[in-house]
Regions:
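Membrane-interface "cap" regions at the ends of multi-pass membrane proteins
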Residues: 1-53, 257, 264-276, 288-291, ...
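Flexible loop linkers connecting adjacent transmembrane helices
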Residues: 16-21, 55-59, 82-107, 133-143, ...
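Extracellular loop-to-transmembrane helix junctions
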Residues: 30, 57-82, 97-109, 152-153, ...
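Juxtamembrane transmembrane-helix boundary signature
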Residues: 42, 69-102, 109-126, 374
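Hydrophobic transmembrane alpha-helices that form the core helical bundles
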Residues: 107-144, 154-155, 368-386, 474
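Loop-to-transmembrane helix boundary motifs in multi-pass membrane proteins
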Residues: 146-157, 387-418
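C-terminal membrane-solvent junction of multi-pass transporters and transport-like membrane proteins
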Residues: 178-181, 381, 395-403, 426-483
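Hydrophobic alpha-helical segments and their helix-loop junctions in multi-pass secondary transporters
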Residues: 184-221, 226, 233-248, 439-452, ...
Length: 495
């Protein structure tokens, strides 16, 4: 019988069942398309707030000097997410459940549950979506109780989240199909608008920003708020460690045996929060697992890092520069308040006419709103339920706690949607995510080197990238907290 290390580090007899490693998809374009689901969701989370709120806003000022931060961010986040994918493919267990094995034992899953709720329960993405829905339809609620005219759309949107989750066959199946459609629709429309709107010098100017050449020649731009620059370092703002849930749900590697959340009309499945075992000594099994890991990594690099993280953020920046910058030079004004979420629709309408503006409003509405599904399902629901599961105190099926948590989070959204403008909320989420990325990088480095078999541990290159992630994330947010945050607080509260 095999022997493993228990969470406390003592040798223990491993009597878990040994599972066969499923046959992986081929490492071809067809295989990449078959493996698209997790990265389509990751893409949808990434191409949303930053692209609708931040990038056109920064480009409108012409302050592209710090776009090189996004290039570095894509590299660092790719290394982190790849290691999280590797762990979950090899174990069938999420990153968040795995942190239960890190000292202090039992603390970290609850840490992640609490900070996820505190950070992502604020409907920063949906706030922009409902503004777009109000503009798109012209339908709003009367100004009663001080509620904004788009509040009725928040009610519809939040109720739709619950309906989808309660009555889906499997929640992941809905997310995967929905986000795949949105991903390709977003790519086609933004590409069309960019080709028509932009001139060659716009492409070149943005490229110089991404490569850091503009910053090297001109230094830091005075017109760019330092908070926005820090938010750029979180772009394209992917799903970080939460991608581990989706590769499990997609059935990658040991994920095939892990169980999924089902709707209320289906019987609950047994969802494990423990590592699943496979024969690591069998060369054939190792080859299959290695291909699953490669598939997860290649899919991440193609769909999220290259297409989402580099190409799409580049196109959104070119659009903002090509259309909004000219108005900024004339008026000195940039979109603010409720105008921020719809600024890309403003670009489309100015370039292609009213019909395109309406279509872009629809795309903005959907691409911002779609983020709320995985935020409630995965960032809040699954993270919290994994904390409950690994505690050993669950007395009901995993799905019961999932629906309690998700329903409570959605109910809170009816109030939280009224608290602040979505761009302000999104900036707060972006800065918090830098801290979470740093903690996650440190934890996955420990987990993969301790828990995975030889040949699957963290490479030297990724070890360096993960440590750079830790240092730059904490360093950037710490510097901002000391030098910028006090002034922002004083400005906000008149101090």
């Amino acid at each position: 019988m095999a022997r493993v290390m228990d969470p406390a580090g003592a040798a223990a007899t491993d009597d878990r069942a040994i599972h066969k490693v499923p046959d992986p998809f081929p490492l071809t374009l067809a295989g990449m398309l078959a493996a698209l689901g997790p990265q389509a969701i990751n893409f949808g989370i990434s191409i949303g707030g930053g692209e609708a709120y931040l990038l056109p806003n920064v480009s409108a000022r012409g302050t592209l000097h710090m776009h090189w931060l996004m290039t570095i961010s894509v590299v660092l986040e790719t290394a982190l997410v790849y290691e999280c994918i590797k762990y979950s493919v090899c174990t069938g267990r999420s990153f968040f459940a795995a942190t239960n094995d890190l000292k202090p034992f039992g603390f970290w899953p609850w840490f992640w549950a609490v900070v996820s709720i505190m950070t992502f329960a604020w409907p920063a993405w949906m706030g922009g979506a409902v503004i777009a829905a109000h503009r798109f339809t012209g339908i709003g609620n009367p100004p009663v109780l001080g509620l904004p005219p788009h509040y009725i759309w928040a009610v519809v949107a939040l109720l739709a989240v619950l309906v989808v989750f309660y009555f889906s066959d499997r929640t992941y199946n809905f997310l995967s199909k929905f986000f795949t459609f949105i991903m390709f629709a977003n790519i086609v429309l933004v590409l069309a608008v960019t080709i028509i709107a932009a001139k060659p010098h716009h492409y070149w100017q943005v490229l110089l920003g991404y490569l850091g050449i503009t910053f090297a020649l001109e230094g830091y731009p005075a017109a760019l708020p330092k908070t926005d620059a820090l938010a750029l370092f979180n772009q394209p703002g992917g799903s970080l460690m939460w991608v581990s849930f989706w590769v499990i749900a997609a059935g990658f590697g040991m994920g095939k045996y892990a169980g999924q959340v089902t709707g209320v009309l289906k019987p609950p499945e047994n969802i494990t929060a423990q590592e699943l075992r496979w024969n690591t000594a069998d060369p054939g099994e190792r080859r299959k697992m290695e291909q699953w890991v490669k598939l997860g990594g290649y899919s991440l690099i193609l769909w999220w890092a290259i297409i989402g993280g580099l190409v799409m953020t580049y196109l959104y920046s070119v659009c903002g520069l090509a259309y909004l910058h000219e108005d900024f030079l004339k008026t000195g004004q940039i979109p603010s308040g409720v105008q921020v979420p719809i600024q890309m629709a403003t670009i489309a309408q100015g370039v292609l006419g009213p019909m395109a503006g309406w279509l872009m409003l629809l795309i903005i509405m959907v691409t911002l709103y779609d983020a709320q599904f995985p935020i409630y399902d995965t960032f809040i629901g699954r993270t919290t339920c994994d904390a409950i599961a690994v505690s050993g105190r669950a007395r009901r099926p995993y799905r019961f706690y999932y629906f309690v948590v998700v329903t409570a989070a959605v109910a809170a959204g009816f109030y939280l949607i009224t608290v602040a403008q979505p761009f302000i909320l999104w900036i707060g989420v972006a800065i918090s995510a830098l801290v979470y990325r740093s903690i996650g990088a440190w934890q996955i480095l420990l987990l993969n080197n301790r828990r995975l078999p030889d040949g699957f541990k963290v490479s030297k290159l990724n070890s360096w990238l993960l440590w750079i992630t830790v240092v730059t994330g904490f360093g950037g947010v710490g510097t901002w907290a000391v030098t910028v945050l006090p002034g922002e607080i004083a400005k906000r509260f008149g101090g």
